[in-house]
Amino acid sequence: TKKVKEVTKEYEVQNKHKPLWTRDPKDVTKEEYAAFYKAISNDWEDPMATKHFSVEGQLEFRSIMFVPKRAPFDMFEPNKKRNNIKLYVRRVFIMDNCEDLCPDWLGFVKGVVDSEDLPLNISRENLQQNKILKVIRKNIVKKCLEMFDEVAENKEDYKQFYEQFGKNIKLGIHEDTANPKKLMEFLRFYSTESGLEMTTLKDYVTRMKEGQKSIYYITGDSKKKLESSPFIEQARRRGLEVLFMTEPIDEYVMQQVKDFEDKKFACLTKEGVHFEESEEEKQQREEEKAACEKRCKTMKEVLGDKVEKVTVSDRLSTSPCILVTSEFGWSAHMEQIMRNQAVRDSSMSAYMMSKKTMELNPRHPIIKVLRRRVEADENDKAVKDLVFLLFDTSLLTSGFQLEDPTGYAKRINRMIKLGLSLDEEEEAAEATVVETAPAEVTVGTSSMEQVD
């Protein structure tokens, strides 16, 4: 009999483990979550936070979301190929990154979503129009906010989270119209009262003075610069806390939000900021306005189109003057940001860079002397020089860019000469002698050459 070789195949199940997201969260260990996170994200570190949840009702899906410990260096690159949310339908893998499951501002969150309701043959084009996907997306955002709340319970953990993903929270306030109030609770800022720690808006409101109606803030490059800004002088004198907003994205955030817990935001670098005053203070300010009317008019005539108007300030304490922008125009910091844009719209910039208002401190010695000089002689040349010098220094202290650096340097040099009691005519004569001396040597040299 002929022997027949019989081949049998035995199949071994490779994925013996039940998918992690289908298990009860109580039965999953921290180590299992960490291993799963590293497998789907290619990260070498454990996640900072984990959210394992399921949604049941009109639709059903399970999900695990992770927050990494560090933000990727190219997180805000527009053309970056992302690998964030993996989509499964009834445990069948559909795609590596489903962009429609998460808004852009949550681009740092990693995880998986397994839906029971989406069709297995769904295409990328159909996903964008799918109503089920929109409901899943809404639930994911909600659960992510809950996860951030859990992180915020530990002060040190949230400090690390905010250092890495604070910009994303602010981007969410700008883009997410459904959750701005909730996202504002996650914001942290330095302030005049917070010291080395950052403060929440909620804590700021609890520390507000009796009768204080606004949340005062100022935008700029750094905390160090803002601490010495002339804009916060009067607020500090009155014991009012001021928030320091030092990131460019803060400017865009404040365009979106107007209040927090019924307290309106007030930018100290713009017009329309008023502090609570007693009747005595109001009367004194009115008297100062009347006394400075002629001086303000003269300064406006000297400066011309450089400023819209010159007024008496109620926000200065020790500085002679500052420049403020209109309530709805760009601040000095925003103007600087837009100047640095490589492809900015020049026509839009010209429209938004509204004319500045110069505010004077009537109690400052320089302004008092200027007032006396104006009253003595409106055509005094020194007055004109002093006005331009005050305007240029106000540009610098208020965060603007100097319009004429050369002219500013010349005026400073003239003031230095006055301080050193140098005579400009004598100096000019000396310069002429120095210039003519080499000319004689040149003539002599050429004559010798002719003799040779």
Swiss-Prot record:
One of its GO terms (cellular component) is cytoplasm. A motif (TPR repeat-binding) lies at residues 448-452. It comes from the Eukaryota. Pfam families: HSP90 (PF00183). ATP binds at residue 124. It is found in: Cytoplasm. Keywords: ATP-binding, Chaperone, Cytoplasm, Nucleotide-binding, Stress response. The keyword Chaperone applies. The TPR repeat-binding motif mediates interaction with TPR repeat-containing proteins. Molecular chaperone that promotes the maturation, structural maintenance and proper regulation of specific target proteins involved for instance in cell cycle control and signal transduction. Undergoes a functional cycle that is linked to its ATPase activity. This cycle probably induces conformational changes in the client proteins, thereby causing their activation. Interacts dynamically with various co-chaperones that modulate its substrate recognition, ATPase cycle and chaperone function. Homodimer. Belongs to the heat shock protein 90 family. PANTHER family: HEAT SHOCK PROTEIN 90 FAMILY MEMBER. This is Heat shock protein 83.
